[in-house]
Amino acid sequence: MATTTVSPGSPGAAWRRVGAFCLDVLFPPVCGGCGRVGVLLCPACVVRLVPVAGPICLCCGRALDRAADIAGGLCRDCAATPPLLAQMRAPLRYAEPASSLIHRLKYEGCFALGPALAGVLIDGWPRWPSPPDLIVPIPLHPRRRRQRGYNQSELLARPLAAAVGVGYSATALQ
C-alpha cells in the first residue's frame, strides 16, 4: 500500500480536505459500532470499548485469571508452547462494540475505520508494560490480500508506530 505525504499547508492538502468534506456530505460516515450517522466511531461506542486490564501474559497479552498463571507471568498456552514472537498485545477485549468494529474493518471493507481504531491503540499505549523494538502487522495470505485489497492490521500498526515513535516493518514476518 503506497502512501503519499502531503505537507499540511500545501494546495494538495487543501484539496484533500475539500474532497474529504464533499465525500462526508455525499456519503456521511457511520459509526462502526452502532450505526450512528456522522462519525466513524461515536463517543458512546468508545466508552463501551473494554480495555484488556489487570495481569496479562507477558508473551501473548491474554488476560490471566488463575493464580498460577499470574505468578508465572505466562498463560497456559505460552507456557506450554511459546510463540515465535516475543510480545503480542491486544488492547481491547473482543466484545461488543470492538468485535463489530473489527469485523467491519476486516470483512466489510470499511477501511476508514483503520485510523479510528488506531487512535484507540494509541490512547492505550501507556498501559503496555514494555514498549517493543518494532511494530509488525500480521501478514495476510497473498490470496486474501488480493481479495480484500488491503491488510487490516497494517491500517492499525503503521499509524500506531508513527504516533509512538517505534520502528515499523510490514515485511518482518514474511
Which residue ranges define each predicted feature?
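Glycine-rich phosphate/pyrophosphate-handling loop used in enzymes and phosphotransfer proteins
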Residues: M1-Q174
